[in-house]
From Swiss-Prot:
PANTHER family membership: 50S RIBOSOMAL PROTEIN L3, LARGE RIBOSOMAL SUBUNIT PROTEIN UL3C
Cited HAMAP family: Ribosomal_uL3_B
Modification sites for N5-methylglutamine: 151
Gene symbol of the encoding locus: rplC
GO annotation terms (biological process): translation
Species in which this protein is naturally found: Rhodospirillum rubrum (strain ATCC 11170 / ATH 1.1.1 / DSM 467 / LMG 4362 / NCIMB 8255 / S1)
Task of the protein: One of the primary rRNA binding proteins, it binds directly near the 3'-end of the 23S rRNA, where it nucleates assembly of the 50S subunit.
Protein name: Large ribosomal subunit protein uL3
């Protein structure tokens, strides 16, 4: 099981295939994604890598976190996430991952926080049809109607779909297709939409419900390996 990546949502655009059909894609940027810490079975009871991405200002980083980053010899990071990995996919602290970690055609799971919508009614939040426009209905056209209880049980069940806060929740979209990657610019293009607003941090992992395709770098798509391959081609 490989590590994932921390990426930042840039926005949406579209690509055209050779046949002329367009594919809507979301652009994700991988910036300074490095290993900050390593968890091993001997010391922690499980195996994982802690990644950090983005470059944070030193004055906005706590003293404890400054020491944490200094131990790994990396710059302060804006976002830190831990990914569970198998023992053969552990990485060294300070190692930098690139967009080449994923390949075109691969399926990935992307986790993030959805855009907050504030307090929303039942029609917007749960797609209720609302009440009648006429026939005695007044004022309450967009209400959710009866909550379905009587003297017994004399309460509204937990989880009842009603008006309330909408959005700003953590979700994972599964089995999204990687259309293309650009390791030089640190870009990953994923088909369709992903959770979050532009600029939001996302966790990109290998899809748990799909097999890894051939050509996926193991244990990870390290930036040093990509640069070495480019230098070899120039020579």
């Amino acid at each position: 099981m490989r590590s994932g990546l921390i990426a930042q949502k840039v926005g949406m655009t579209r690509l055209f295939t050779d046949e002329g059909t367009h594919v809507p894609v979301t652009v994700l940027k991988v910036e300074a994604c490095q290993v900050v810490a390593v968890r091993t079975s001997e010391t922690d009871g499980y195996t994982a890598v802690q990644l950090g991405a983005g470059v944070a200002k030193v004055k906005r980083t706590s003293k404890a976190m400054r020491g944490h980053f200094a131990a790994a010899k990396v710059e302060p990071k804006k976002k830190v996430v831990e990914f569970r990995v198998s023992e053969d996919c552990l990485l060294e602290p300070g190692a930098e991952l690139s967009a080449a970690h994923f390949v075109a055609g691969q399926k990935v799971d992307i986790a993030g926080t959805t855009i907050g919508k504030g307090f929303a009614g039942a029609m917007k939040r749960h797609n209720f049809r609302g009440l009648e426009a006429t026939h005695g209905v007044s004022v309450s056209h967009r209400s959710h109607g009866s909550t379905g209880q009587c003297q017994d049980p004399g309460r509204v069940f937990k989880g009842k779909k009603m008006a309330g806060h909408m959005g700003d929740t953590r979700i994972t979209q599964q089995s999204l297709t990687v259309v293309a990657t650009d390791a030089d610019r640190g870009l990953i293009l994923v088909k369709g939409s992903v959770p979050g607003a532009d600029g939001a941090w996302l966790e990109v992992r290998d899809a748990v419900k799909k097999k890894l395709p051939e050509g996926v770098p193991l244990p990870a798509g390290l930036k040093a390996a990509v640069e070495a391959a480019v230098d070899g081609e120039k020579e």
